[in-house]
Swiss-Prot record:
Organism, scientific name: Shewanella sediminis (strain HAW-EB3)
Protein name in the entry: Ribosomal RNA small subunit methyltransferase H
Source superkingdom: Bacteria
Signal peptide: none
Gene of this entry: rsmH
GO MF, one example: rRNA (cytosine-N4-)-methyltransferase activity
Statement: the UniProt record of this protein carries the keyword Ion transport: no
Length: 314
């Protein structure tokens, strides 16, 4: 059972699961299990012959999945959602998946547990790995990264306007003392920040950028979206929650690209039917944002956006 201290509220829960248009005997993927909120809701809608396959690379999420150990309809894979298609193919289920749910947010237990190193508000080791059993930590990367590389990461993944200034200050400070704690890095950024945004900690963008880079999040998202499209059955649904503009732009462009199909040069002798074959998705409704009531209950839902699409006939 999860401790109250690290409890997690799933964002846009009702809307996301409704977007899957669940069939009682369908097969569904929760590509970002987290602490199981969305999975629990999906299971409520499945009959005894339905099936839910969850994926997560966080060992703590895998442990949390024990809550469903007695449910024969549920199984979980320890791995990144970017490998979603591979896991489904290994199970012999390619083209048979009725819905894929992806929630790209960092879970509240990850943010609130100082030992995970994601938060600039709680002091802890500067880690930030989604799977803290492998890979380079944020502290290791900051210790070795060139100024130009840091500036590029901060600007590209955090949309940080002062990326070069912050990178130079980090490089100067690490010569004296290495950055090993989240508070050390957050305090430096707060001290040197030129443009303070209202209601936003000065370190927000830099911490986001480092986390995205360390975990290859945007590459994982791209692979997950393409993978989901490749495994969905005709009329299968894709429900995707993003939390910042970089993610949402990727999802929006992905859906739009596959709704429009391939671009055909003017005058090429090709039929409308042939053009339609390249249209693989149709968008379902407009982007959905949380209600005021949900944001009041869970302030972390504020920036979330849900987009839904449906797989067309092959």
């Amino acid at each position: 059972m999860m401790s109250q201290e690290f409890a997690h509220l799933s964002v846009l829960l009702t809307e996301t699961v409704a977007g899957l248009n669940i069939k009682e005997d369908g097969i569904y993927i929760d590509g970002t299990f987290g602490r199981g909120g969305h999975s629990r809701e999906v299971l409520k809608h499945l009959g005894e012959n339905g099936r839910l396959i969850a994926i997560d690379r966080d060992p703590q999420a895998i442990a949390a999945a024990e809550q469903f150990a007695d449910d024969a309809r549920f199984s979980i894979v320890h791995g990144g959602f970017g490998q979603l298609a591979t896991y489904v193919e290994d199970l012999g289920l390619k083209g048979k998946i009725d819905g894929v749910l992806l929630d790209f947010g960092v879970s509240s237990p990850q943010l609130d547990d100082a030992e995970r190193g994601f938060s600039f508000l709680r002091d802890g080791p500067l880690d930030m790995r989604m799977d803290n059993s492998q890979g380079e930590t944020a502290a290791d990367w900051i210790a070795r990264a060139e100024i130009e590389d840091m500036a590029w990461v901060f600007k590209t993944y955090g949309e940080e306007k002062n990326s070069r200034h912050i990178a130079r200050c980090i490089a100067a400070d690490r010569e004296k003392t290495p950055f090993l704690r989240t508070k050390e890095l957050a305090d430096l950024i707060a001290r040197i920040s030129k443009n303070k945004e209202r209601n936003k900690h000065p370190a927000t963008r830099v911490f986001q950028a480092i986390r995205i880079y360390i975990n290859s999040e945007l590459e994982q998202i791209d692979q997950a979206l393409e993978g989901a499209l490749s495994v969905l059955a005709p009329h299968g649904r894709l429900s995707v929650i993003s939390f910042h503009s970089l993610e949402d732009r990727m999802v929006k462009r992905f859906i739009r690209r596959h709704c429009q199909g391939e671009s055909v040069p003017h005058g090429l002798p090709i039929t409308e039917a042939e053009i339609n074959k390249s249209r693989l998705l149709k968008g379902i409704g407009k982007a959905i944002k949380p209600s005021e009531e949900e944001v009041e209950r869970n302030t972390r839902a504020r920036s979330s956006v849900l987009r839904i699409a449906e797989r067309l006939e092959y």
